[in-house]
From Swiss-Prot:
Residues 25-489 are lumenal. Protein O-fucosyltransferase that specifically catalyzes O-fucosylation of serine or threonine residues in EMI domains of target proteins, such as MMRN1, MMRN2 and EMID1. Attaches fucose through an O-glycosidic linkage. O-fucosylation of EMI domain-containing proteins may be required for facilitating protein folding and secretion. Also shows minor alpha-(1,3)-fucosyltransferase activity toward activity toward biantennary N-glycan acceptors. However, this was tested with a library of synthetic substrates and this activity is unsure in vivo. The lineage of its organism: Eukaryota, Metazoa, Chordata, Craniata, Vertebrata. This is GDP-fucose protein O-fucosyltransferase 4. It is an enzyme of class 2 (transferase). Glycans are attached at residue 162. It comes from the Eukaryota. It is found in: Endoplasmic reticulum membrane. Belongs to the glycosyltransferase 10 family. Widely expressed. Expressed at slightly higher level in heart, kidney and lung. Residues 1-7 are cytoplasmic. It comes from Mus musculus (Mouse). Its EC number is 2.4.1.221, 2.4.1.-. Keywords: Disulfide bond, Endoplasmic reticulum, Glycoprotein, Glycosyltransferase, Membrane, Signal-anchor, Transferase, Transmembrane, Transmembrane helix. The chain crosses the membrane at residues 8-24.
Length: 489
């Protein structure tokens, strides 16, 4: 799969970073190790944390007089992801106090380093820092697709972490609406029906499919291919392409993930957008869902099974899984295409008072981070402060225990739960898995990748419990787990 630098995440959030060359094979792959990885040497404060800038987090008071040398340290472990610029260390002022954020791996050995922050796409069990130090929390940021790291979709993998920020509403710092700027984004007026009727007369299909990332865990192309037998679909991009974009500029696949004005005007011609996520998981919703709604099109959606919880009202999206077959879905879309009054009911949320889902409105109103909002912090810095405040509270609890002569118990460690990701095994986009040939590329790739994630999570958990110090033993652990499982089959 195409590699990309974590810098794309920071750029989307308006945060600067320095990225190194990428060598991973995931969809949003991690960067290569920095040239000076932590080598177990004694921590040297002047080199690692000597030059500390100042940043303030959401709801934070002005900086106090506490010296940076006394503050707990948060270490960003993923190379290339550090939401501060320039330098390697930054004092951050958060709601309950201050911490030092750093990306210098030499800081790991220092007792002041209280948390390691990992970016899920970059996290590799084979390269996890060992031995795991008892006083350090592991914090996970993983807002991207489950396909980037299936280790995190299994209990043993997600429970490696103490704090999480994922697309799941159940995570400690939830990011399910990361692609939705606000309610106003949904209220943008739709094009008049007569405009789209004119495009239909010019030969445009009722349905748009725009994908260039093919062969994904959701197996969406298999479903769309079957749907095309029953209704016209204009397919752009590299997947099932049957029509060329009207301009050279729109042929650039990078443009397809943006809100480029020319692209948006082009997409607005279509009444229905096929919106199939690349992986299936509760609360995993991307621009594939929200952008059609912004443009006044009706999403024909497959992705998050919990998507109804987030819709502006109960009649704004067509769910593929509500139909017993692609043929039945095609018949329903054809009916709406020929009946403007019925079609417009799906756009009622754009009218004053049309957004009736209070759960959606409350989540948009009360989140402390924003999307392209200069008045709010981005979720990277927000999560960083969430971790800082947690570690400050944990330090205070440990001090209270120490001074109580045992009257106050030791604070219990916080452990992530399966619900913080909880992504199921991939299933075929159409048909049954036993009907698919064994040499099918989807079957060969994604089922194996999914279960390999389980073995890797179990292996790393065992290594931590055994206080292993040598990462090179990781694949021996994986092999042993694999052999035991196959022996019991």
């Amino acid at each position: 799969m195409a590699a990309r630098c974590t810098e794309a995440v920071l750029a989307a959030l308006g945060v600067l970073s320095v990225c190194s060359a990428s060598s991973s094979g995931s969809e949003a792959s991690g960067e290569a190790e920095r040239e000076e990885p932590w080598d177990g040497a004694v921590f040297r404060p002047p080199a690692a944390l000597g030059a500390v800038g100042i940043a303030r987090g959401p709801g934070s008071p002005p900086p106090g007089n506490r010296e940076a040398v006394d503050l707990p340290v948060l270490l960003w472990w993923s190379p290339g992801l550090f939401p501060h610029f320039p330098g390697d260390s930054e004092r951050i002022q958060c709601a309950h106090g201050a911490c030092v954020a750093s990306r210098d791996r030499r800081a790991r050995a220092d007792p002041r380093t209280r948390a390691l922050l990992f970016y899920g796409t970059d996290f590799r069990a084979a390269d996890a820092p060992l031995p795991r130090l008892a006083h350090q929390s592991w914090a996970l940021l993983h807002e991207e697709s489950p396909l980037n790291n299936f280790l995190l979709s299994h209990g043993p993998g997600i429970r490696l972490f103490n704090l999480t920020a994922t697309f799941s509403r159940h995570s400690d710092y939830p990011l399910p609406l990361q692609w939705l700027p606000g309610a106003a984004y949904l209220r943008r007026p739709a094009p008049p029906p007569r405009e789209r009727a004119e495009w239909r007369r010019r030969g445009y299909a009722p349905l748009l499919y725009l994908q260039s990332h093919c062969d994904v865990p959701s197996d969406r192309d298999r479903y769309v291919r079957e749907l095309m037998r029953y209704i016209p679909v204009d397919s752009y991009g590299k997947c099932l392409q049957n029509r060329e974009p009207p301009t050279v500029r729109l042929q650039d696949t990078a443009t397809a993930t943006t809100e480029d004005p020319e692209l948006m005007a082009f997409l607005s011609r279509y009444k229905f957008h096929l919106a199939l996520e690349n992986a299936i998981c509760n609360d995993y919703m991307t621009e594939k869902l929200w952008r059609p709604m912004h443009l006044g099109a009706v999403p024909v959606y497959r992705g998050s099974p919990s998507v109804r919880d987030w819709m502006p009202n109960n009649h704004s999206v067509i769910l593929i899984d509500d139909f017993e077959s692609p043929q039945k879905l095609a018949e329903f879309i054809d009916f709406l295409d020929k009946n403007d009054d019925e079609y417009m009911k799906y756009l009622a949320y754009k009218q004053p008072g049309g957004i009736t889902n209070q759960f959606l409105l409350d989540n948009l109103e009360h989140r402390e981070w924003g999307v392209n909002d200069p008045m709010l912090p981005n979720y990277l810095n927000g999560f960083e402060c969430f971790v800082c405040d947690h570690e400050l509270a944990r330090l205070n609890a440990e001090k209270a225990h120490a001074s109580s002569h045992g009257d106050i118990p030791v604070p219990e460690p916080r452990i992530a739960q399966s619900s913080h990701m909880n992504c199921p095994v991939p299933t075929p986009g159409f048909g049954k898995v036993e009907e698919i040939p064994e040499n099918d590329s989807w079957k060969e790739m994604w089922l194996q990748d999914y279960w390999q994630g389980l073995y890797q999570g179990e292996a790393l958990t065992a290594m931590i419990h055994n206080n292993e110090t040598q990462q090179r033993k990781f694949w021996d652990y994986v092999h042993e787990i694999f052999m035991k499982r196959n022996k019991n089959l």
